[in-house]
Every structure is written in structure tokens, then in C-alpha cells.
């Protein structure tokens, strides 16, 4: 289960602290003696009761909305594969920039957020390098300057960043998160380049419940569903059970020759390489975040999150640059 959306009451730093704390201007509520919610309920529990419901009404309230979403987003404008720190950052920027676009976010896990609920080695704090602090300012996430290095800032708990970003993404009316849903394949169309009769473009994704995907090897055939979209943004992370999926699929469908393979950890070179090389790798498919390290052979970045955020910003920028052209191509050849 994902952690709930976090609130944060700014407190004065201890006298021994030399770190400067960034304090967002937004106010945060807390349960105090003057809280409206306590005024509403405190001391009245003997007379408390919930309104009466019927179980089928609960079922219908859930299923009706979900199937309406499936119908609405069967034709999407943009699909984002992977709701980690990079994918959610992409969704946030796109949601703000283009509220007219239908954006589907597909996440294999029950809990979106990827590895961004904690820092390195299951520690709480999240470390990032400037100028990624500007993204935190835009989100309204508080952070501290790091006394040991003026180029670094620290969020007191990674979950504070992820819950804030996730809550903002989910508040956009044009974005739908389908979690516990796996992308099993890519929808393709022929797109021959000059002198090349075998080129392809990506035209959407093939989906299934994650629990179904995990059992294809021990159950009979369970066919998938589909979402058409002129542009797919893949941010599935480095190689793993579901990681680097689109990158690996491009190799198996002969769209690219081979993967570069992620190199050993080097934060300084890895972060800049990931941000600067976030791009459309084939028509209709943008790849960002650590998935790029598998395609290009960049270094691993480890427990630092600046590039994840700004690669998401860059992926959104690339999407805005190419979207209208990809949309026209899909309209021309359905």
C-alpha cells in the first residue's frame, strides 16, 4: 500500500544545525485543539454513525468509474510507462503544460513511486543536486541545504517528495493512473525511412493485469488489452523484472541492434548523461530516466535523484516538441 499523501509542519531548526531549510509558502493543516475536524467529532463518538449503504452500491461505484476510464483512455494522447520519480515528474510537467491532452500512466506495481519512497539502502533522506531544487520549489516540497556541499540539497524523507508529486499528478483531471497494470508489449506501425523498408513507429501499448503477466508461464493463454496513443514515454528504470522493458523490447523486435548495458556507479557522469540524452529513440517512443542507461551504456547513478526529476522534465519537453507531428502521423495511417 502506498503511503498516504504527506503533510509537513515547518519547525525551527535545532540550534546545532547549520543547514538552511527551504520553506514553501503554502500552509499545511495539522490536528490541533483548533482543528475544524476535531471540532466536528471530538466528544461526540457515542452518537456517531456512518450513513447506510448497500454493498452492491460500493461495487458499482468502483467498477463504473474504472470502466469509464478504460473506455476514455483506450485512445490516449500520451502513455507514460512507469510511475517512478521520472515518470511522475514527466506526468506533472505535461499535466500543467497541456491540460487538453489525455495522459495515461501505467504502473506495474500496486504502489506507484518506484524506488523513490526511500533514499539509498532503505534510508529516509532523499539527496539531489542543484539545479533540481527548482523542481522542488515548483512542487512546494521543503528541503535543506547540505552543509558539506553547497551543490546538494536534502529532503528529510523521500516519501515527502513522492507523496507530494503523486498527489499533484493525480489531481490533474486529464491524467489517469492505471496501477497494478503491466505493459506487455508495444503497438507498432510500419514507418519506413528513406531507403529503409523495415522502420517502425510506436502507436500505443499492450496491457494486462500485473498478476496475470506474472503467471503467463504457469497458466493457459490470457490475452491482453490495448491503449492506442501516438506517443509513448517509457521510464521503467534499469534492468529488472519489469525494468527497461521498452528498451529490451526494441531489441527483440529489431528496432535497435543491441543494448549498451548499464555501467558501474558514477554519480557525476551518470546524472548529466541521463538528462542530456533523454530523447525520442524511435518514432513515437521517448525514453527517460535509468532506462536510458541500458540503451546507451551510461553509468549507474545510485542513491541520488536529481536526474530522475530533470530527465522527467526533459522527457515532457521532448514530448511537447514532437506530439503534434506524431498525432498527424497516427491520424494519416490508422
UniProtKB/Swiss-Prot annotation:
GO cellular component: cytosol; nucleus
Post-translational modification note: During the catalytic reaction, a sulfide is transferred from Cys-221 to a reaction intermediate, generating a dehydroalanine residue.
2,3-didehydroalanine (Cys), modified sites: 221
Note on how the cofactor is bound: Binds 1 Fe cation per subunit.
GO molecular function: cysteine-dependent adenosine diphosphate thiazole synthase activity; iron ion binding
InterPro entries according to UniProt: FAD/NAD-bd_sf (IPR036188), Sti35 (IPR027495), Thi4_fam (IPR002922)
Keywords, ordered alphabetically: Cytoplasm, Iron, Metal-binding, NAD, Nucleus, Thiamine biosynthesis, Transferase
Family statement: Belongs to the THI4 family.
Subunit organization: Homooctamer.
HAMAP family registered for this protein in UniProt: THI4
Residues annotated as binding substrate: 86, 107-108, 115, 183, 223, 238, 290, 300-302
Alphabetical list of SUPFAM superfamilies matching this protein: FAD/NAD(P)-binding domain
Subcellular location: Cytoplasm; Nucleus
Known cofactor(s): Fe cation
UniProt cross-references to PANTHER family, sorted A to Z: THIAMINE THIAZOLE SYNTHASE (PTHR43422:SF3)
Reaction(s) the record says it catalyses: [ADP-thiazole synthase]-L-cysteine + glycine + NAD(+) = [ADP-thiazole synthase]-dehydroalanine + ADP-5-ethyl-4-methylthiazole-2-carboxylate + nicotinamide + 3 H2O + 2 H(+)
Function: Involved in biosynthesis of the thiamine precursor thiazole. Catalyzes the conversion of NAD and glycine to adenosine diphosphate 5-(2-hydroxyethyl)-4-methylthiazole-2-carboxylic acid (ADT), an adenylated thiazole intermediate. The reaction includes an iron-dependent sulfide transfer from a conserved cysteine residue of the protein to a thiazole intermediate. The enzyme can only undergo a single turnover, which suggests it is a suicide enzyme. May have additional roles in adaptation to various stress conditions and in DNA damage tolerance.
EC numbers on record: 2.4.2.60
Protein known as: Thiamine thiazole synthase
Primary localisation category: cytoplasm
GO BP term, pick one: thiamine biosynthetic process
Keyword Metal-binding: yes
Amino acid at each position: 500500500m502506498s503511503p498516504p499523501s504527506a503533510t509537513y509542519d515547518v519547525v525551527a531548526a535545532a540550534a546545532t544545525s547549520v543547514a538552511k531549510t527551504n520553506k514553501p509558502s503554502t500552509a499545511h493543516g495539522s490536528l490541533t485543539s483548533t482543528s475544524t475536524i476535531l471540532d466536528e467529532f471530538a466528544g461526540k463518538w457515542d452518537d456517531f454513525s456512518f450513513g447506510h449503504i448497500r454493498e452492491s452500491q460500493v461495487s458499482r461505484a468502483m467498477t463504473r468509474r474504472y470502466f469509464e476510464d478504460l473506455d476514455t483512455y483506450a485512445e490516449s494522447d500520451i502513455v507514460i510507462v512507469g510511475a517512478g520519480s521520472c515518470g511522475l515528474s514527466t506526468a506533472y510537467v505535461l499535466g500543467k503544460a497541456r491540460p487538453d491532452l489525455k495522459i495515461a500512466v501505467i504502473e506495474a506495481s500496486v504502489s506507484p513511486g518506484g524506488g523513490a519512497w526511500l533514499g539509498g539502502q532503505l534510508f529516509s533522506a532523499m539527496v539531489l543536486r542543484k539545479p533540481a531544487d527548482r523542481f522542488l520549489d515548483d512542487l512546494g516540497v521543503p528541503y535543506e541545504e547540505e552543509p558539506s556541499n553547497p551543490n546538494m540539497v536534502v529532503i528529510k524523507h523521500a516519501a515527502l517528495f513522492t507523496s507530494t508529486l503523486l498527489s499533484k499528478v493525480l489531481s490533474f483531471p486529464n491524467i489517469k493512473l492505471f496501477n497494478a497494470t503491466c505493459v506487455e508489449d508495444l503497438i507498432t506501425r510500419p514507418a519506413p525511412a528513406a531507403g529503409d523498408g523495415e522502420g517502425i513507429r510506436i502507436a500505443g501499448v499492450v496491457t494486462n493485469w500485473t498478476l496475470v503477466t506474472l503467471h503467463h508461464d504457469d497458466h493457459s493463454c490470457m490475452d491482453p488489452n490495448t491503449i492506442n496513443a501516438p506517443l509513448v514515454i517509457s521510464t521503467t528504470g534499469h534492468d529488472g523484472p519489469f525494468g527497461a522493458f521498452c528498451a529490451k523490447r526494441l531489441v527483440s523486435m529489431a528496432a535497435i541492434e543491441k543494448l549498451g548495458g548499464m555501467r558501474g556507479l558514477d554519480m557525476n557522469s551518470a546524472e548529466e548523461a541521463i538528462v542530456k540524452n533523454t530523447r525520442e529513440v524511435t518514432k513515437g517512443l521517448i525514453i527517460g530516466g535509468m532506462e536510458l542507461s541500458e540503451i546507451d551504456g551510461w553509468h549507474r547513478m545510485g542513491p541520488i535523484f536529481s536526474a530522475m526529476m530533470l530527465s522527467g522534465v526533459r522527457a515532457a519537453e521532448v514530448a511537447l516538441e514532437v506530439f503534434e507531428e506524431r498525432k498527424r502521423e497516427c491520424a494519416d495511417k490508422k
